[in-house]
A protein has these predicted regions:
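Catalytic-site beta-strand/loop segments enriched in glycine and acidic/polar residues
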Residues: 137-171
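Helix-to-loop junction immediately C-terminal to a conserved catalytic motif
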Residues: 43, 47-79
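Single conserved hydrophobic/aromatic residue that forms the stacking wall/gate
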Residues: 1-23
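Catalytic core of membrane glycerolipid acyltransferases/transacylases, capturing the structured
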Residues: 69-127
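A cross-family acyltransferase "interaction/gating" segment
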Residues: 158-227
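Hydrophobic/aromatic ligand-binding patch that stacks against planar heteroaromatic rings
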Residues: 91, 116, 136, 172-176
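Generic beta-sheet signal
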Residues: 71-77, 142-150, 179
Length: 251
């Protein structure tokens, strides 16, 4: 993880940037079961500023936003880089969708990055409480984003299939809540901000390409979290392949 001063500086630059790269692709989404509009609008503002800052360093291809008929939903993505957090905020800004990621609680205790996570309304997760916390947040109308691998995965582990070993929590959450699941595949962040580096790679001559694709998996059925997890990870794997394929995978 990066040094404390570096984390603070990156947070200020990404959240405080006023340079406009591009506007959101549409208005904020509203559903019958939506979060408090004032809180959602405040979060959307932070997402926009992060998107503008990240746009100075990388090109973003986030695709069309998922077509879901109701909220809240569970978004599940792979995790190759610390840049995934900032890319997530940019994605949610582009989609006009106030979504709250679950993040390991230990990061909130670190100066600089902890403040940024709170401004992004990330949900701190400590141990086995993840399912209860996510359930409470979704009951208030918020969609949540999770990274089933639970850590930044080394390339040696994800290279064979595109993903690392996942933890079972997302399978339990999907079955317990009975909400639609959207699989997301991310590529490019591992080159932009490689695992183990204190800073992303910054070049004055080019911006790193970051690409995501998604697939709406729908509601998980059955009573076996391991089966639900397997289906979710298979969806993420297909989406990762689509980021590197001429044919694009969308629902």
């Amino acid at each position: 993880f990066f040094k404390q001063k570096t984390a603070y500086e990156i947070g200020v630059r990404l959240v405080g940037s006023e340079m406009c790269i591009r506007d959101s692709s549409g208005p904020m989404r509203e559903f019958l079961n939506s979060p408090d509009p004032t809180e959602a609008a405040a979060l959307a503002g932070v997402h926009r500023r992060v998107a503008r800052g990240l746009g100075l360093l990388a090109t973003l291809d986030v695709g069309v936003r998922p077509e879901v008929s109701e909220e809240p939903v569970i978004l599940a993505a792979n995790h190759r880089s610390m840049a995934d957090l900032f890319l997530a905020a940019a994605i949610f800004s582009e989609w006009g969708w106030p979504i709250r990621p679950l993040v390991a609680g230990s990061y909130f205790d670190r100066p600089g990055i902890g403040g940024l996570l709170r401004r992004l309304r990330c949900i701190p997760v400590r141990g086995s409480e993840a399912l209860d916390i996510a359930t409470e947040v979704m009951a208030d109308g918020w969609s949540v984003a999770v990274m089933p691998e639970g850590r930044v995965v080394p390339e040696a582990e994800w290279a064979p299939t595109g993903v690392g070993t996942a933890r079972p929590g997302v399978g339990r959450l999907a079955l317990a809540r009975g909400r639609p699941v959207v699989a997301i595949g991310v590529s490019g962040t591992e080159r932009f901000w490689p695992r183990g580096r204190n800073l992303p790679r910054i070049s004055p001559w080019r911006r790193f390409p970051l690409r995501i694709r998604h697939e709406v998996l729908g509601v998980m059925v059955g009573d076996q979290p391991s089966v639900a997890l397997e289906e979710i990870m298979a969806g993420i794997t297909r989406c990762i392949a689509a980021t590197e394929s001429p044919s694009e995978l969308f629902d």
